[in-house]
Amino acid sequence: MGDKKSPTRPKRQPKPSSDEGYWDCSVCTFRNSAEAFKCMMCDVRKGTSTRKPRPVSQLVAQQVTQQFVPPTQSKKEKKDKVEKEKSEKETTSKKNSHKKTRPRLKNVDRSSAQHLEVTVGDLTVIITDFKEKTKSPPASSAASADQHSQSGSSSDNTERGMSRSSSPRGEASSLNGESH
């Protein structure tokens, strides 16, 4: 009674394949070498099944209800955030409304103000021109400073532009000084 074999059930035979040195990943179908324990593309272990588990109906119902609830709350939260930001902006603008501060340049000598009035049609604009602060004035910048104080005509603007570009720091400093 020791030899019980079922004649109807054949033995499992390995697949006849020409590529014995490789295995195909069950997830990404990448062909890996036989020595590889994990897939070289997706790091899935060799022999991992791709069968998806059946969803539990209670869990699915719970997840579905959670998906629909957060959007309504997030809209309220967004609305509250927007209102809060608006109120903060209003309070900051109210605080700053009583004193208007103009942006100030740090590299400007305020004592060297020169005012120039330009009128076009019925509009008059006053341009206040300041000299740059220099830590140690070289001979070339001192000469350009003399040109500033001597000239007072409307062609003064072109001379100023040229004298600024000949400053020791070059054109970059004059651009930075004027753009702010």
From Swiss-Prot:
GO BP field: negative regulation of DNA-templated transcription; positive regulation of DNA-templated transcription; regulation of DNA-templated transcription
Basic residues bias (residue ranges): 95-105
Pfam families for this protein: YAF2_RYBP, Zn_ribbon_RanBP
Basic and acidic residues bias: start-end ranges: 74-93
Keywords: Metal-binding, Nucleus, Phosphoprotein, Transcription, Transcription regulation, Zinc, Zinc-finger
Main location (coarse class): nucleus
A GO MF term: zinc ion binding
Single GO cellular component term: nucleus
Zinc finger regions, RanBP2-type: 19-48
Subunit (UniProt): Interacts with MYC, MYCN, RNF2/RING1B and YY1. Part of the E2F6.com-1 complex in G0 phase composed of E2F6, MGA, MAX, TFDP1, CBX3, BAT8, EUHMTASE1, RING1, RNF2, MBLR, L3MBTL2 and YAF2.
Protein name: YY1-associated factor 2
Protein encoded by which gene: YAF2
